[in-house]
From Swiss-Prot:
This is Porphobilinogen deaminase. It comes from Nitrobacter hamburgensis (strain DSM 10229 / NCIMB 13809 / X14). Gene3D superfamilies: Periplasmic binding protein-like II, Porphobilinogen deaminase, C-terminal domain. The modification S-(dipyrrolylmethanemethyl)cysteine is found at C249. PANTHER family: PORPHOBILINOGEN DEAMINASE. The porphobilinogen subunits are added to the dipyrromethane group.
Amino acid sequence: MQSSGETDILATIGTRGSALALAQANEVRDRLARAHQVAPERIVIKTIRTSGDAIQDRPLFDVGGKGLFTKEIEEALLAGSIDFAVHSSKDVPTFLPDATWLPAFLPREDVRDAFISPRAASLNDLPAGSIVGTASLRRQAMVLRLRPDLKVSVIRGNVETRLRKLVAGEADATLLALAGLNRLGLQDRATRILETDEFLPAVGQGAIAIESRRDDDRINAFVKAIGDSETEVALSAERSFLALLDGSCRTPIGGHCRVNGDRIHFRGLIISPDGTQSYETTREGARADAAALGADAARELRERAGEKFFTLFAGA
């Protein structure tokens, strides 16, 4: 939407309607307003209900995996009813529609997972047989790898809903992204923060992605003003890794890239849903080679695990 006046709408953001999604969209809007020295009100936020929001009774890996939180928003983007979308990067499929791309990522929040429990100080302190509630296959697998004597049950819903279910006794503990708690001002709910060496995060965790139409030069220039180059490099490696390893919610995958000047350090993991089999690799290389480094790490794990690993657990 081209504008000329000081009160005209400059852009319309599409986002999910959860408190976390709106917090992320508002952060993008405020950063854009500061970068372009305009009133935040000139950037409108439009909420869009997605398939992932509508399905609350099953784990996402049973109903299509990745894309459930972005499909309807992408449809609005392609139809022109919004100018760009704001997503949690870990929800964005590795393969986008041909007409869209990710021109910018905000500076990354904390990538770690948080352990939350009213009954134990840590995952190790939970009594045998305790129930850990999560809808994430990665978190399920990593919990069972560390504590095979625990039980995992499905807890779906937004951050606040999952915390309410925990208080109501539907589980003894749950795991949530620390970034989401931070953005909602709920970081004090974290019982313990899980370090990445024991609990590798999801690809893209903690990063906010902007998706726009490739041919919309005005909007692309508009949003690139708030893009963070380090996050873009890290996500290039992580998403390249994910793309070669299925990248759906049916495959428990962890991946994290750290950027240090012109060098990057990548760690990747594939794991069976029951936590009994896992393959891990690390890579170091040049920042400019991020995508190739992530792809190389994925090829190594595919070769080491063998195709049987992926077919065996595809329906798990």
